[in-house]
UniProtKB/Swiss-Prot annotation:
<dbReference type="GO" id="GO:0016020">
    <property type="term" value="C:membrane"/>
</dbReference>
<dbReference type="InterPro" id="IPR012506">
    <property type="entry name" value="TMEM86B-like"/>
</dbReference>
<keyword id="KW-0378">Hydrolase</keyword>
<feature type="topological domain" description="Extracellular">
    <location>
        <position position="43"/>
    </location>
</feature>
<feature type="transmembrane region" description="Helical">
    <location>
        <begin position="71"/>
        <end position="91"/>
    </location>
</feature>
<keyword id="KW-0812">Transmembrane</keyword>
<feature type="topological domain" description="Extracellular">
    <location>
        <position position="92"/>
    </location>
</feature>
<feature type="transmembrane region" description="Helical">
    <location>
        <begin position="44"/>
        <end position="64"/>
    </location>
</feature>
<feature type="topological domain" description="Extracellular">
    <location>
        <begin position="137"/>
        <end position="138"/>
    </location>
</feature>
<keyword id="KW-0443">Lipid metabolism</keyword>
<dbReference type="GO" id="GO:0016787">
    <property type="term" value="F:hydrolase activity"/>
</dbReference>
<feature type="transmembrane region" description="Helical">
    <location>
        <begin position="22"/>
        <end position="42"/>
    </location>
</feature>
<feature type="transmembrane region" description="Helical">
    <location>
        <begin position="116"/>
        <end position="136"/>
    </location>
</feature>
<keyword id="KW-1133">Transmembrane helix</keyword>
<protein>
    <recommendedName>
        <fullName>Lysoplasmalogenase TMEM86A</fullName>
        <ecNumber>3.3.2.2</ecNumber>
    </recommendedName>
</protein>
<comment type="function">
    <text>Catalyzes the hydrolysis of the vinyl ether bond of choline or ethanolamine lysoplasmalogens, forming fatty aldehyde and glycerophosphocholine or glycerophosphoethanolamine, respectively and is specific for the sn-2-deacylated (lyso) form of plasmalogen. Plays an important role in lysoplasmalogen metabolism in the adipocyte tissue and macrophages.</text>
</comment>
<feature type="transmembrane region" description="Helical">
    <location>
        <begin position="93"/>
        <end position="113"/>
    </location>
</feature>
Length: 240
């Protein structure tokens, strides 16, 4: 088991470019009303840095750890989605949603299906259903279906990320903590986007959306550092 302190000490320096790029985004705070390739680059820069963070562990690491590879590819689709959302008012919002839907499926695949965590899954089904029920009266046209599918996909990703948190004590590894927290923050970010776009203006929505989004992506990238092993292995080791 790798402790959070050990991860911070070993991986913190590799994340310095990410933190700097994130600061650049918030300091420049380019107006969203004037989309440009410069604003797209500034928005995507922290995600590019997370690419480099994973690549810094070597191509061999990615090739021998399928979950890390899927998270890396998910970050690639995230950057494409970020670029599309810069021009969301010009008709590219659905394109961005599609890219992030692919991202969530890749992340869910990286998190795996063990342990199954049926209770966590049931909870996510209930929460996802409540979110969609709240959004539904404000959805029109294709968004009625597109948003429903997206909610189901991100809910599934959240389930797979948090399923490993069902045990306590030594079974809680950094991988599950980072993945679960990252997924939760991603859901908060996307829910804020949905509320602000379809329901009502959310105060300081952009700051809330981007801060939770960048934190989520960082934590999910960090979850790839320690190779994921089934939590059932912990039960077996305890039984011995």
């Amino acid at each position: 088991m790798v402790s959070p302190v050990t991860v911070v000490k070993s991986e913190g320096p590799k994340l310095v470019p990410f933190f700097k790029a994130t600061c650049v985004y918030f300091v420049l705070w380019l107006p969203s009303s004037s989309p440009s390739w410069v604003s797209a680059l500034i928005k995507c820069l922290p995600i590019f840095c997370l690419w480099l963070f994973l690549l810094a562990h070597g191509l061999g690491f990615l090739l021998t750890h399928p979950s890390a590879t899927r998270i890396f590819v998910g970050l690639v689709f995230s950057a494409i989605g970020d670029a599309f959302l810069i021009w969301q008012d010009q008709g590219y919002f659905v394109h961005g949603m599609l890219m992030f839907a692919v991202t969530h499926m890749l992340y869910a695949s990286a998190f795996g299906m063990r342990p199954l965590g049926l209770r966590t899954g049931l909870l996510m089904v209930i929460l996802s259903g409540l979110c969609y029920a709240f959004l539904y009266p404000n959805l029109t046209g294709a968004f009625t279906y597109v948003v429903g599918v997206y909610v189901a996909i991100i809910g599934f990703m959240g389930w797979r990320a948090m399923a490993g948190l069902q045990l306590v004590g030594a079974a809680w590894r950094w991988t599950e903590l980072a993945a679960g927290t990252g997924a939760l923050l991603f859901i908060v970010s996307d829910l804020t986007i949905a509320l602000d776009k379809f329901c009502f203006p959310v105060p300081y929505s952009r700051a809330l959306i981007m801060s939770t989004y960048y934190a989520a992506q960082m934590l999910i990238a960090l979850s790839a550092v320690e190779s994921r092993e089934p939590v059932e292995d912990y039960r077996l080791s305890k039984a011995k």
